[in-house]
Amino acid sequence: MIVKYIKGDIVALFAEGKNIAHGCNCFHTMGSGVAGQLTKAFPKILEADKLQTEWGDVTKLGSYSVYEKYFRTHKAYCFNLYTQFQPGPNFEYSALMNCMLELNEFGENKLIKPTIYMPRIGAGIGKGNWDIIEGILDTYSSKLEIVIVDWEPLL
């Protein structure tokens, strides 16, 4: 469930050790938007996508791959949510629903709900309607605390 909206830099939040999730396509293409920013800063995010999934595999739509970054006291997760099959304005609401059902399992059996930071997933390059996306996130993430990050550069 969405617990708050903040202004910030999701790349910096991941570098600080926060769990994040972002939308991507099924063709190992993370060259623009939030995915592009993340893979430029953390190339292993794209490497995890390529190692854990097949290029152009339609069956990964609605699932995710994950990159684990280790810190001294914990590990942070970057979830690559397959919210659209092809790059561009091709966001699929049903894929997000399935991604969130799977991601929600990450929060099962945890004493404290995990916090996941996300951009306005699917509403940028994917051209999804944020009002619908927001409803999906709230409905399918009862075991998570989601923080939506509206991009604002660090000064």
UniProtKB/Swiss-Prot annotation:
InterPro entries: ADP-ribose_metab_enzymes (IPR050892), Macro_dom (IPR002589), Macro_dom-like (IPR043472). It comes from the Viruses. Gene3D superfamilies: Leucine Aminopeptidase, subunit E, domain 1. It holds the Pfam family Macro. GO terms for biological process: peptidyl-glutamate ADP-deribosylation. Residues 1-155 form the Macro domain. This is Uncharacterized 17.5 kDa protein in tk-vs intergenic region. It comes from Enterobacteria phage T4.
